[in-house]
């Protein structure tokens, strides 16, 4: 797969591997490896166990603040923009970018392309539903403008932003992987 596992501790790797072996119904490593060789879906699920999905809205606030200063003042952004969010996880980062672009580009001549290796996490990202905790860095003004409260704990991204963010699967470490073209 080309995934760098050096940041994992050995116990953590063993725990995740044992979890997948149990789910697959295999009691020993040799049986599990044979099962992996025959079952592509199991192989994908194992890979997903070893990819970490960490994200939150406006995470690394200083970077978003810098990006915001780089965006032209409201009303001056006339050209089409295409922004790529690589390793987008469950969608908080690309939607954070979309919020900023919407605020600074009133003509909607922009799109965010969001990619990740994990199919399951992309499915969640496409749903556009986030918890109160995941929105902790989103101001009340932005919450009112860009989210709909579903219940006490969940919020849905607004349709105006949802249609501006396109999610797709991409493994950045595969030699033939190509980033989306035309991105700023």
Across the structure, where does each feature detected by a protein language model lie?
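Conserved AdoMet
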Residues: 1-84
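Conserved class I S-adenosyl-L-methionine
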Residues: 78-96, 110-113
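Extended basic-aromatic, gly/pro-enriched interface segments that bind polyanionic ligands
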Residues: 108-184
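Short, well-ordered alpha-helices that flank and scaffold nucleotide-derived cofactor binding pockets
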Residues: 69, 99-103, 127
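Conserved strand-to-helix beginnings and helix N-cap segments that scaffold or border functional pockets
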Residues: 10, 61, 94-95, 179-180
């Amino acid at each position: 797969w080309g995934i760098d596992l050096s940041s994992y501790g050995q116990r953590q790797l063993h725990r995740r591997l044992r979890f997948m072996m149990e789910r697959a119904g295999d009691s020993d490593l040799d049986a599990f490896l044979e099962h992996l060789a025959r079952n592509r879906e199991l192989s994908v699920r194992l890979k997903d166990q070893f990819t970490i999905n960490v994200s939150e809205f406006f995470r690394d606030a200083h970077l978003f603040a810098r990006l915001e200063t780089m965006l032209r003042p409201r009303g001056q952004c006339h050209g089409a923009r295409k922004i790529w969010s690589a390793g987008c996880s469950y969608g908080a980062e690309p939607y954070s970018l979309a919020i900023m672009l919407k605020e600074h580009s009133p003509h909607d001549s922009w799109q965010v392309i969001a990619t990740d290796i994990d199919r399951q996490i992309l499915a969640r990202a496409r749903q556009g539903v986030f918890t109160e905790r995941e929105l902790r860095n989103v101001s009340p003004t932005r919450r009112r403008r860009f989210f709909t409260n579903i219940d006490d704990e969940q919020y849905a991204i607004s349709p105006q932003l949802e249609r501006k963010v396109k999610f797709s699967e991409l493994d950045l470490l595969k030699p033939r992987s190509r980033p989306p073209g035309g991105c700023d």
